Amino acid sequence: MAENKQNLQDAFLNHVRKTKVPVTIFLINGVKLQGVITWFDNFCVLLRRDGQSQLVYKHAISTVMPAQPISLYDGEE
């Protein structure tokens, strides 16, 4: 049986990217970044705000908080 499930981190980041939900990213050093996630991969996230992009390395991220509630549950298990 082939499992084709996406991990939670990728599902979350992809959802906020596709829906363009503004997020607040807290870094492990306490810095707060805000913007819209436009791209991500295994190692980093591209955050856009006011026409500027910031490349943020995932190892520096503590928390990603969307500006509004999101639902990742699609009713299937």
UniProtKB/Swiss-Prot annotation:
GO terms for biological process: regulation of DNA-templated transcription; regulation of RNA stability; regulation of translation, ncRNA-mediated. InterPro entries: Hfq, LSM_dom_sf, Sm. This is RNA-binding protein Hfq. Keywords: RNA-binding, Stress response. It comes from Jannaschia sp. (strain CCS1). Coiled coil: none annotated. One of its GO terms (molecular function) is RNA binding. RNA chaperone that binds small regulatory RNA (sRNAs) and mRNAs to facilitate mRNA translational regulation in response to envelope stress, environmental stress and changes in metabolite concentrations. Also binds with high specificity to tRNAs. Belongs to the Hfq family.
